[in-house]
């Protein structure tokens, strides 16, 4: 029910007045005018005295004429301003004197009707009134305000309570009894205890400044809300007497009845506190427990809870909702986080009930009785908490686990409740797993993980592992166990690792895995978990298997095992069990240690047997099996053997059966499973098996190892297996098994491949390789053997790899072992047949490879240690050592073994070459001896082909060496066939043998091509490249093609190197010297096939150059493919150990391709670099270039710079250091153009150059600085030619300047000056065509940003220096101004703004920039368009804080509006408003001020606050509608951008402006005059924001004027004067219209009700706002809602700019 409001127009009514009244009115108006000129507090007293005299100048003479106050709103406003906190007590005293006079004369009835005019000014005074003022104020309350009618008191109840509570917040206050008496009087006069209490709770919830006073009142007056015992007993007796009445099926009726019963057991006074809304009490208590409150407030609230609102109160368990109860309990628990013991003790006692508090105070008495009572009290407390608090606490904590922000709180509360065992023992078991899951979910948050670890360490271990066991058994979630083992402190807790982890391991092993869904997860995680658990379990947690009475053939049920473990953990971790029993630590585990050890080992063995049967996870199973047996202690008598209770037969049998199946499988994954079998056999079974059985099994295992040794994809795996066997089994047995597999293998290439692998992978002192080596070398004994050539080529590869010494050592060591050199006579113990064999073997080895082996043998230094047996003889090389050995052997007199002598002589013949020191003596001694051997061709096609190629090669070499002319072919058909053979034959080659021979032939042939090579190099190189690519594809699919690819790349390298040499010679000499040509058959072949005439020598040379470069391009592309592939694999292998073999291979490919690229780089650096850039210009290529130039940028950069110059200025004469002098002649081929000239842009080269320089270390800048400076000077001189790439060049300059500045070299004045000088020469022309070239190119502006950040390094000047500013000004004028012209209508792209934002950081002293932004800020249209952009906000803010602008901008805007600084308090300044354009201008300036404040931080313009708010008040009480709208916006900006404390002096004026504006609108509705909807919208939005922000100065004592501020807003049973609700009752707002605003139904999101509404057509569209504001604001306070300040700010910005 709304009350009528006194209209504002009463101030200027035109009713008939007599002369005395007119004089009375005039006196009052004159007195009011005096307030306009006050400057200090004394003026206020004088003005108030004048006002009092004016009010006393008339009194009614007749009883029917009542006293009145002229212009009551104006008088009230002046009185309110006189009660400002800034004024002294004397002014306040005088003001109260005036108030007293007015109240006394107008009477209570008039005061009640005009309460909205007179009461608001008095209400805030109690908060800051001095002692002298307070007594007068109390009298005013006592004599007038509190005597108002009940209807008035009901609408004033909240502001009155708010105004009186500050008077009782200090209990030492002298006026405390009087103020308490006032509140009692208020409650009594109100005659509505329910409304009183509900409003009190609302005040304490919304206004934190009133909470201390509120608690003072509650402590004295709050009735107990606990159940009264005798009333409870009475209800119980009634229920027992009438059992039928207690039963009902209707839940609603049942709930209603329960509430009625709850009220029956409470004190009568308690009902008023919880009706109609019990939730208000809870919110009041919760609000008082928030962190922001003083500790005294929290302590008082907790005392209230303990004494008058226990946890078992019917209010908490019946009358309020479960959500409210949860809210209260969680607030209490959050309070424990402050770790104040005085608070925590109260909270625990409240949660545990009255017995807990008594228990703490119980001292003395009989100890036995005391112990019993404590135990009883404990049990009672637990029952109490379980019944009344546990579920709410658990639910509240669970709610916290869903959001990352609140998980930390949940952990901390959980740790806090551990302090009270009675609570913790109930809460932690229930929450442990959910807390773990939440920490796993947010494990990236370091703070959460740190807290989770602390929580884990503090939790009782039985609870941890009991709950984890339950989770494993019920949900089979291995992930959470893995998370615990990985992230928490497990290893340092003795109880965990000894007692619990073995049980958890047994649980995991016993869990069934037949469920398909579970099985997939299980397979992924189980072995990892087994190993993690085993790593933690110490040896002392296990006992020898022999100690257990269990046997391997005992049937053990996994279900039984799990049931026993379940029973154990149920006992030790279940809360109910914990409470019932004592001595948890002493409870027995489900198994003895010895039985537990046996069960774990038994189940792991079953896992292994299962894996061997399925051929899956054998490696993991075996690793686990070995790990457990390494961990289990062994009895002394059973060292290395199994106890009789244990059997390994099943494992042995399973391995015998599994290996053949593994060997038959073609699955790569299965092939790797052999590792586990090898590990089991070597590390476990071998020592426990019978010898014969172990040898049988070793042979079978070696067959599987042999298979992996043969497979190129698993060779490294095979070697690893071999090494594993060698670690556990004597070498002689392994060697025997290995030789067996060698003999069984029929394919010589496979045997050789394995031998080569073992040669490279096994240690040089390994004996495993000797016997297989002898078997392979045995193939050399017969040169007609089809495998002879294969073995000899392998020996050649050994020589090439640099490991010949190892081969020679083995061969000579075998001879020395048999031949005892110190003997002069032979006896029957000497094995001459073996010696003969060793002699023959070495002889056949030395005969291989056309004497190459012999040559290396002759020069290779021996590694055999010196000994006395050698005396003074030379044994430094293997040749000299063997010569000494042979001579000694031949000198033995009694040797009748002709075969051994003959073998020695053959070997001697091979070694002798005439260079020996004792050559003559040897020849004389062996004069009668000779040796012969016969060489015949092979029989297989491959070997025939190789032989043919070798013959041709040999003929070519010999003819060249001896100058012999070969005229084998006479007709052109033969010539063509030869060339065609070279080009086409390579296309089908695969075998390394054939490729080796082909490359050798090619190498011999190149010598004869000479100048004709230019006509055949292209098809020849193309054919070679195609072959490499074909083999490379096979390599990627199958592997094993490294050798032929490497040989072909070597051939290509030689071909290109020699052909390029001919080109260089030709370019130097201009022609070939014909007299030096060798007239051989290849020359004539090439000339006949590719003859061509050239009329012009120069064009001929250019054509030849093009051919060479085209070949280069093909080879570069091919090499890059190989290098990139190898590089990617080597990168991946760092993360994946399974790629070891592939990685080993990739390094070989990478090295070989790099070697060829290095050669090409030496020959044609620029050509190679440009091809690299065109193929792939990324960071990998930059890495490759660093590899090629050896991390010496001075080699690479000049070529790249030259590549740029030649594309833009071919006539340039720049001479870079390494292109013209310092390098060999091959690096300065500048006669011809690069082949990529038209296919690769200069922009691309500069982009690559930028990335390359960026990757170079700063210290390397000095190396190429001179070349870079030459380049920059060239660009600056011919700027017009380089205009297309000017920005890229500037970016490069910026990068280099930045890097140079960070070096010692860059500290030299010359260096810093040189770049700066060239830059300033270039700067005026660098951006001439910028807008044309780069319009719409975001990247170009990113590049400019890069440059701008580094300008200080380029110009060698500090930020703000003259050079720096000049550069920035140029960039602004030429690059930014065309886009940011204030008069331009086009939208400014985001990338331009990003650059502008960078300039704004650095350009505080750049005049053109400052003027540009100033002009834009002054342009109203442009600002409204750009202002909403966040980047623009940063720019405007940066501009506004420049030293020249910081205070000037706001001062200028205020000056233009016409404001001036306020005096002691806000006063009115007269503004003469002119034309509409002037008003519009002022509006725009007000909005600019608003925008400027919004883009600035809070309190940035604090010095201007007084002027700003004064300006606002002046216009808000004026008549200008448009200015009012802008001022309301500015007021909202101040509310968001300045701290609440700065408004303390101004709340009354803010309230007055809001009140008068809304009341004018209200009266306009009544008389149906015209209303400006936009102004009303802004007024409403301001009120909306004020209510949302809940600023105490406004809401506590002024809110009631505008909205219904009590629970009456819901029911509206009491009268009200709230303007918003008064307006809502107007008839225009009764009918719903289609254009009504759709407003939200809640304020939970923290945004105003009118968010997003910036313009309306009619005021009636606000119908929903007026009707719902009071209720929604009440709901927001009730819901303890927060405020979204950012969202409010964004909405306000749209108001400013719309």
UniProtKB/Swiss-Prot annotation:
Membrane topology type, per the record?
Peripheral membrane protein
Chief place of localization: Golgi
Q: Which residues carry this modification: Phosphoserine?
A: 244
Which is one Gene Ontology cellular component term of this protein?
Answer: endosome
InterPro entries given for it?
ARM-type_fold (IPR016024), DOP1 (IPR040314), DOP1_C (IPR056457), DOP1_N (IPR007249), TPR_DOP1_M (IPR056458)
GO biological process terms, semicolon-separated: cell morphogenesis; endoplasmic reticulum organization; Golgi to endosome transport; protein transport; retrograde transport, endosome to Golgi; retrograde transport, vesicle recycling within Golgi; trans-Golgi network membrane organization
Q: Keywords for this entry? A: Golgi apparatus, Membrane, Phosphoprotein, Protein transport, Repeat, Transport
Q: Where in the cell is it found?
A: Golgi apparatus membrane
* GO MF annotation list: identical protein binding
| Domain of life per record | Eukaryota
Give one Pfam family, short name only: TPR_DOP1_M
Q: Give the free-text miscellaneous remark of the entry.
A: Present with 2700 molecules/cell in log phase SD medium.
Function as written in the Swiss-Prot or TrEMBL entry: Required for traffic between late Golgi and early endosomes, and for the normal structure and organization of the endoplasmic reticulum. Required for normal cellular morphogenesis.
What does the sequence similarity comment in the record state about its family? Belongs to the DOP1 family.
The record's note on quaternary structure and interaction partners says: Interacts with MON2.
Q: What is this protein called?
A: Protein DOP1
Which species?
Answer: Saccharomyces cerevisiae (strain ATCC 204508 / S288c) (Baker's yeast)
């Amino acid at each position: 029910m709304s009350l009528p409001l006194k209209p504002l127009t009463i101030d200027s009514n035109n009713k008939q007045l007599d002369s005395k009244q007119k004089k009375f009115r005039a006196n009052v108006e004159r007195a009011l005018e005096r307030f306009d000129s006050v400057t200090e507090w004394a003026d206020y007293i004088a003005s108030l005295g004048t006002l009092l005299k004016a009010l006393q100048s008339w009194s009614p003479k007749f009883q029917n004429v009542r006293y009145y106050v002229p212009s009551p709103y104006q008088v009230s406003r002046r009185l309110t301003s006189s009660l400002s906190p800034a004024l002294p007590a004397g002014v306040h005293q005088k003001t109260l004197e005036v108030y007293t006079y007015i109240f006394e004369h107008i009477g209570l009835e008039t005061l009640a009707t005009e309460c909205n005019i007179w009461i608001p000014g008095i209400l805030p005074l109690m908060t800051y009134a001095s002692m002298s003022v307070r007594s007068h104020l109390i009298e005013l309350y006592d004599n007038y305000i509190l005597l108002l009618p009940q209807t008035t008191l009901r609408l004033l109840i909240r502001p009155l309570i708010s105004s009186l509570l500050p008077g009782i917040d200090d209990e030492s206050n002298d006026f405390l009894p009087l103020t308490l008496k006032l509140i009692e009087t208020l409650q009594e006069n109100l005659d509505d205890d329910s409304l009183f209490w509900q409003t009190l709770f609302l005040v304490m919830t919304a206004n934190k400044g009133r909470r201390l006073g509120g608690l003072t009142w509650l402590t004295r007056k709050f009735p107990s809300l606990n159940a009264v015992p005798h009333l409870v007993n009475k209800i119980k007796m009634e229920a027992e007497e009438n059992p039928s009445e207690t039963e009902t099926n209707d839940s609603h009726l049942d709930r209603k009845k329960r509430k009625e019963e709850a009220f029956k057991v409470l004190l009568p006074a308690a009902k008023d506190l919880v009706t109609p809304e019990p939730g208000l009490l809870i919110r009041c208590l919760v609000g008082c427990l928030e962190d922001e409150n003083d500790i005294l407030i929290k302590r008082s609230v907790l005392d209230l809870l303990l004494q008058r609102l226990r946890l078992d109160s019917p209010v908490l368990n019946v009358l309020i909702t479960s959500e409210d109860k949860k809210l209260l309990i969680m607030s209490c628990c959050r309070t424990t986080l402050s770790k104040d013991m005085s608070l925590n003790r109260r909270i625990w006692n409240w949660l545990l009930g009255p017995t807990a508090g008594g228990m703490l105070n119980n001292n003395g008495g009989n100890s036995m009785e005391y112990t019993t009572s404590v135990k009883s009290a404990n049990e009672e407390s637990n029952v109490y908490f379980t019944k009344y608090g546990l579920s709410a606490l658990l639910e509240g904590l669970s709610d916290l686990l869903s959001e990352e922000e609140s998980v930390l709180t949940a952990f901390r509360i959980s740790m806090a409740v551990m302090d009270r065992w009675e609570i913790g023992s109930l809460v932690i078991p229930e929450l442990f797993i959910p807390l773990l899951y939440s920490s796993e979910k947010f494990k990236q948050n370091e703070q959460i993980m740190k807290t989770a670890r602390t929580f884990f360490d503090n939790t009782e271990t039985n609870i941890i592992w009991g709950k984890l066991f339950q989770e494993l058994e019920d949900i089979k979630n291995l992930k959470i166990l893995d998370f615990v083992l990985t992230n928490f402190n497990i290893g340092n807790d003795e109880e965990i690792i000894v007692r619990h982890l073995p049980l958890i391991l047994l649980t995991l092993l016993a869990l069934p895995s037949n469920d398909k869904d579970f099985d997939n997860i299980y397979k992924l995680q189980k072995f990892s978990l087994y190993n993690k658990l085993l790593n933690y379990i110490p040896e002392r947690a296990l006992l020898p298997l022999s100690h257990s009475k269990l046997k391997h053939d005992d049937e053990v049920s996994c279900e039984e095992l799990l049931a026993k473990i379940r029973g154990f953990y149920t006992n030790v971790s279940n809360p109910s069990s914990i409470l019932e029993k004592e001595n948890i630590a002493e409870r027995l585990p489900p198994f003895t240690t010895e039985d537990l050890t046996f069960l774990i080992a038994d189940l792991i063995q079953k896992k292994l047997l299962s894996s061997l049967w399925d051929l899956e996870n054998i490696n993991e199973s075996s690793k686990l099996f070995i790990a457990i047996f390494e961990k289990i202690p062994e009895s002394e008598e059973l060292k290395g053997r199994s106890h009789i209770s244990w059997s390994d037969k099943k494992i042995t049998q399973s391995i015998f059966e599994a290996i053949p199946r593994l060997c038959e499988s073609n699955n790569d994954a299965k092939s790797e499973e052999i590792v586990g079998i090898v590990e089991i056999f070597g590390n476990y079974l071998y020592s426990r098996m019978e010898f014969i059985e172990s040898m049988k099994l070793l042979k079978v295992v070696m067959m599987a190892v042999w298979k992996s040794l043969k497979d190129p994809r698993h060779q490294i795996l095979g070697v690893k297996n071999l090494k594993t066997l060698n670690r556990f089994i004597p070498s002689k047995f392994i060697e025997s098994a290995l030789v067996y597999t060698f003999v069984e293998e029929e394919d010589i290439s496979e045997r050789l491949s394995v031998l080569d692998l073992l040669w490279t992978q096994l240690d040089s002192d390994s004996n495993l390789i000797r016997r297989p080596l002898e078997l392979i070398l045995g193939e050399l004994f017969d040169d007609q053997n089809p495998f002879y050539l294969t073995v000899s080529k392998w020996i050649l590869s050994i020589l090439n790899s640099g490991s010949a010494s190892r081969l020679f050592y083995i061969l000579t060591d075998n001879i020395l072992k048999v031949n005892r050199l110190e003997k002069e006579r032979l006896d029957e113990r000497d094995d001459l047949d073996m010696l003969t064999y060793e002699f023959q073997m070495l002889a056949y080895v030395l005969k291989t490879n056309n004497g190459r082996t012999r040559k290396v043998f002759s020069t290779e230094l021996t590694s055999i240690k010196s000994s006395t047996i050698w005396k003074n003889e030379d044994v430094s090389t293997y040749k000299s050592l063997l010569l000494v050995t042979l001579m000694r052997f031949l000198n033995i007199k009694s040797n009748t073994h002709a075969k051994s002598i003959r073998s020695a002589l053959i070997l001697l013949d091979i070694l002798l070459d005439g260079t020996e020191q004792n050559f003559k003596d040897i020849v004389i001694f062996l004069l009668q001896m000779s040796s012969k051997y016969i060489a015949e061709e092979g029989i297989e096609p491959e070997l025939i082909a190789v032989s043919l190629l070798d013959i041709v090669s040999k003929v070519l070499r010999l003819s060249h060496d001896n100058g012999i002319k070969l005229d084998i072919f006479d007709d052109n058909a033969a010539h063509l066939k030869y060339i065609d053979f070279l080009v086409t034959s390579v296309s089908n080659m695969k075998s390394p043998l054939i490729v080796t021979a082909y490359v050798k032939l090619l190498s011999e042939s190149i010598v004869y091509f000479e100048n004709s090579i230019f006509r055949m190099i292209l098809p020849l190189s193309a054919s070679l490249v195609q072959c490499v690519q074909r083999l490379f594809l096979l390599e990627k699919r199958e592997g094993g093609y490294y050798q032929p690819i490497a040989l072909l790349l070597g051939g290509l390298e030689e071909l290109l190197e020699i052909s390029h040499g001919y080109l260089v010679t030709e370019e130097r000499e201009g022609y070939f010297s014909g007299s030096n040509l060798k007239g051989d058959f290849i020359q004539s072949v090439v000339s006949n096939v590719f003859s061509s005439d050239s009329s012009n020598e120069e064009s001929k040379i250019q054509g030849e150059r093009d051919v060479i470069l085209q070949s280069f391009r093909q080879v570069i592309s091919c090499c890059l493919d190989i290098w990139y592939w190898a590089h990617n694999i080597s990168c991946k292998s760092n993360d994946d150990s399974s790629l070891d073999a592939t990685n080993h291979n990739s390094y070989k490919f990478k090295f070989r391709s790099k070697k060829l690229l290095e050669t090409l780089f030496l020959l044609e650096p620029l050509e190679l670099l440009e091809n690299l850039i065109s193929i792939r210009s990324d960071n990998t290529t930059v890495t490759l270039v660093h590899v090629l130039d050896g991390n010496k940028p001075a080699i690479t950069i000049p070529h790249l710079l030259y590549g740029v110059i030649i594309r833009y200025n071919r006539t340039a004469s720049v001479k870079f250091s390494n292109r013209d002098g310092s390098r060999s002649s091959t690096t300065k081929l500048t006669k011809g153009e690069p082949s990529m000239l038209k296919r690769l842009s200069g922009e691309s080269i500069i982009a690559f150059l930028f990335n390359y320089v960026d990757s170079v270390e700063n210290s390397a800048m000095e190396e190429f600085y001179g070349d870079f400076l030459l380049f920059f000077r060239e660009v600056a001189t011919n700027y017009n030619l380089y205009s297309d790439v000017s920005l890229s060049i500037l970016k490069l300059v910026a990068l280099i300047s930045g890097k140079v500045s960070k070096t010692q070299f860059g500290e030299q004045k010359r260096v810093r000056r040189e770049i700066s000088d060239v830059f300033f020469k270039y700067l005026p022309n660098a951006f001439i065509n910028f807008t044309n070239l780069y319009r719409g190119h975001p990247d170009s502006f990113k590049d400019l940003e890069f440059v701008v950040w580094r300008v200080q390094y380029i110009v060698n000047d500090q930020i703000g220096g003259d050079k720096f500013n000049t550069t920035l000004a140029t960039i602004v004028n030429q690059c930014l101004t065309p886009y940011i012209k204030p008069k331009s209508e086009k939208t400014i792209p985001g990338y331009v703004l990003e650059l502008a934002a960078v300039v704004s950081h650095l350009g505080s002293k750049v005049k053109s920039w400052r003027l540009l932004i100033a002009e834009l800020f002054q342009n109203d249209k442009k600002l409204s368009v750009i202002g909403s952009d966040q980047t623009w906000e940063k720019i405007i803010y940066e501009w506004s804080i420049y030293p020249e602008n910081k205070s000037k901008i706001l001062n200028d805007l205020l000056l233009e509006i016409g404001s001036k600084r306020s005096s002691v308090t806000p006063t009115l300044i007269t503004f003469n408003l002119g034309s509409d354009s002037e008003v519009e201008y002022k509006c725009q300036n007000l909005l600019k001020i608003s925008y400027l404040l919004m883009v600035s931080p809070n309190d940035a313009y604090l010095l201007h606050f007084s002027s700003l708010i004064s300006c606002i008040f002046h216009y808000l009480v004026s008549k200008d509608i448009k200015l009012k709208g802008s001022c309301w916006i500015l007021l909202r900006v101040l509310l968001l951008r300045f701290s609440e404390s700065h408004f303390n002096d101004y709340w009354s004026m803010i309230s007055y402006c809001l009140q008068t504006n809304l009341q004018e609108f209200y009266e306009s509705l009544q008389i149906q005059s015209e209303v400006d909807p936009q102004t009303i919208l802004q007024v409403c939005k301001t009120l909306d924001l004020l209510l949302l922000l809940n600023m105490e100065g406004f809401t506590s004592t002024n809110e009631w004027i505008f909205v219904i501020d009590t629970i009456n807003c819901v029911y509206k049973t009491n009268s009200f004067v709230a303007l918003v609700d008064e307006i809502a009752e107007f008839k225009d707002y009764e009918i719903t219209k289609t254009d009504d605003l759709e407003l939200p139904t809640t304020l939970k999101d923290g945004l105003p009700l009118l968010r997003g509404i910036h313009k309306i057509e009619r005021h009636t569209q606000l119908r929903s706002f007026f009707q719902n504001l009071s209720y929604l604001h009440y709901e927001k306070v009730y819901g303890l809602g927060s405020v979204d300040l950012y969202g409010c700010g964004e909405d306000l910005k749209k108001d400013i700019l719309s």
